[in-house]
A protein has these predicted regions:
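Bacterial N-terminal signal peptides that target proteins for export
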Residues: 2-9
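Bacterial N-terminal signal peptides
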Residues: 9-17
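Sec/Tat signal peptide C-region and signal peptidase I cleavage site
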Residues: 19-23
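Exposed, interaction-prone regions of secreted/extracellular proteins
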Residues: 24-283
Length: 283
């Protein structure tokens, strides 16, 4: 299983095989030179008529190395999982493959993102992609959010099932974050204007790589995405850059479950290049 998983991730995300055993680039993400920079229209998401993402909702006591949540799955990294240091996380990035969503009779939803904060506090600075099935029709779009501030759709950013997406959030200075989203298959990238990415409340305590069941008054049904693959999951914490499982900090997997303990989404163990997969189990 692990060999098959790594083969799929490395081939589909176009990651050199040597990165599995040799230290890879963990520098601050930038737009690839062969990408076309596109300016996308930033469209506010109406909170009263549209779902949104939400900070981590834990279930039961926190457990290490695997915690439980009713709306998140994936991985989190902090200086310390029980008492994380503020102002410690300055960057996060990852790549993932846009999943093929299976149609369902009811409306279902799925968000894939990277972000800073939200696991141990109530702010989140995040960017990612959304994949829903509404009235039996699959819809995908890119978005970002500075929770509890506004949520925004990134209109004009291309997304198709099978595309390889890269995303990053980097703290620059003076409460400003830089957010970059790239479609490596279609070779386009966009940078979110910094007028949208300021936060005076961000604690910068945690880095997260997440598959989420979005929220609108309550947690929404999780779309059947099959398996989501993420790789090159990197962070910079206390000035040290590395993959999720760097020894300079602590990390934990997160399994998404229902209130009755039924697994909804289970992440695999980490590969040495920060790769993991998440398998859908239940709405």
């Amino acid at each position: 299983m692990k060999t098959r998983f790594l083969t799929q991730v490395l081939s589909l995300l176009l990651i050199p095989g040597s990165s599995l055993v040799v230290a890879a680039d963990t520098s601050t993400p930038s737009i690839p030179k062969d990408h076309v920079r596109i300016e996308c229209k930033i469209k506010p998401i109406d909170r009263n008529s549209h779902h949104r993402t939400h900070p981590h909702i834990p279930f039961g006591e926190m457990r290490i190395p695997l915690g439980y949540s009713t709306n998140w799955s994936g991985y989190v990294a902090e200086t310390n999982l029980t008492n994380p240091a503020a102002n410690s996380v300055s960057a996060i990035s990852a790549s993932w493959i846009v999943p093929t969503i299976k149609a369902s009779t009811n409306s279902t939803y799925c968000a894939i993102w990277v972000g800073i904060d939200g696991y141990s506090n109530s702010t989140v600075e995040q960017i990612g992609t959304e994949h829903d099935c509404i009235n039996k029709k699959v819809q995908s779009y890119a978005w970002f959010e500075m929770y509890p501030g506004g949520s925004y759709e990134i209109n004009g950013f291309p997304l198709k099932a099978g595309d390889v997406i890269s995303a990053s959030v980097t703290y620059t200075a003076k409460n400003v974050f830089t957010m970059i989203l790239s479609n490596n298959t279609q070779k386009v990238s966009t940078t979110i204007p910094t007028s949208y990415t300021k936060s005076t409340t961000a604690k910068r305590q945690s880095a997260e790589w997440i598959i989420e069941a979005p929220y609108m008054n309550s947690i929404l049904p999780l779309a059947n995405f099959g398996t989501v693959y993420l790789a090159n999951c990197k962070a910079t914490i206390n000035g040290v850059s590395g993959f999720i499982n760097n020894n300079a900090w602590s990390n934990s997997g997160i399994e998404m479950i229902t209130n009755s303990n039924t697994p909804k989404d289970i992440p695999t163990t980490l590969a040495s290049n920060g790769a993991f997969a998440a398998a859908w189990k239940h709405q």
